[in-house]
């Protein structure tokens, strides 16, 4: 069985320097590395750009150098935030010229470029907003269904814009698709669920599937982060749509009444 090193679980590498990262990878000699460690809070990154750059650019570059030196296949997570600032509608392909408008997106785009310069066979996965439910005793950050459930429980509202469009992905599909992703040719891939609905409609659909009543406040910001998945599909890897994904999630947890 091949040894795969997954970063991002304990925070060890995020606190380490380049020498420690290199030493760890040389010692473990993995056949592949899945680099999932990141500082992904966009607001925090905006307020702490140097820390964001270290975690989201410098660290993965160190990992890439060590991966190349050891011969390990590298798979690293990027983000749909690289598309922040794109004004065109519809699903966005990987080939678009990009100028992200937030610190996190700029860091992720720089990371992609620098990692591919070092390791042309590295696979960079642009992930969307992801979610799971708290059924495995694992820490879970705020996500769409949890935010809706908390709002319903406490009688508070959630805010979304009808001009905001993005995919929302069930994280266990991301996990299931990692093994085939390790066999992809080097390059950048959109990696998540498609969505033809705006975020107001998406939140309403999730609330309906969860069988809860939630007050949704309308905002007026405009954003399109919907990713085109054709490149990934041509390689044989597919995701549910955003709407199919929440139903898949509820079935997995035995909560789908259909």
Question: Predicted segments — roles?
Answer:
Residues 61-99:
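Conserved Rossmann-fold NAD(P)-dependent oxidoreductase catalytic core, especially the SDR/UDP-sugar
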């Amino acid at each position: 069985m091949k040894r795969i090193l997954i970063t991002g679980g304990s925070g060890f590498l995020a606190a380490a320097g380049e020498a420690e990262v290199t030493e760890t990878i040389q010692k473990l000699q993995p056949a592949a590395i899945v680099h999932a460690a990141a500082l992904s809070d966009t607001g925090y990154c905006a307020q702490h750009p140097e820390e964001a750059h270290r975690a989201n650019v410098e660290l993965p570059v160190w990992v890439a150098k060590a991966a190349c030196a050891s011969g390990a296949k590298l798979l690293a997570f990027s983000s749909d935030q690289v598309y922040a600032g794109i004004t065109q509608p519809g699903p966005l392909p990987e080939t678009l010229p990009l100028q992200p408008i937030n610190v996190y997106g700029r860091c992720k785009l720089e990371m992609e470029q620098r990692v591919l310069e070092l390791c042309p066979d590295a696979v960079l996965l642009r992930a969307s907003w992801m979610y799971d439910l708290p059924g495995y005793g694992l820490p879970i950050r705020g996500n769409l269904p949890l935010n809706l459930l908390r709002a319903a429980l406490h009688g508070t509202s959630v805010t979304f814009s009808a001009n905001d469009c993005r995919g929302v992905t069930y994280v266990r599909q991301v996990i299931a698709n990692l093994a085939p992703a390790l066999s992809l040719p080097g390059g950048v891939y959109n990696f998540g669920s498609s969505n033809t609905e705006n975020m107001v409609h998406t939140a309403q659909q999730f609330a309906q599937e969860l069988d809860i009543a939630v007050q949704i406040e309308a905002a007026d910001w405009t954003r399109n982060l919907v990713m085109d998945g054709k490149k990934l599909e041509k390689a044989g890897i597919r995701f549910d749509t955003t709407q199919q994904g929440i139903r898949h999630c509820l079935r997995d947890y035995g909560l789908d009444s259909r």
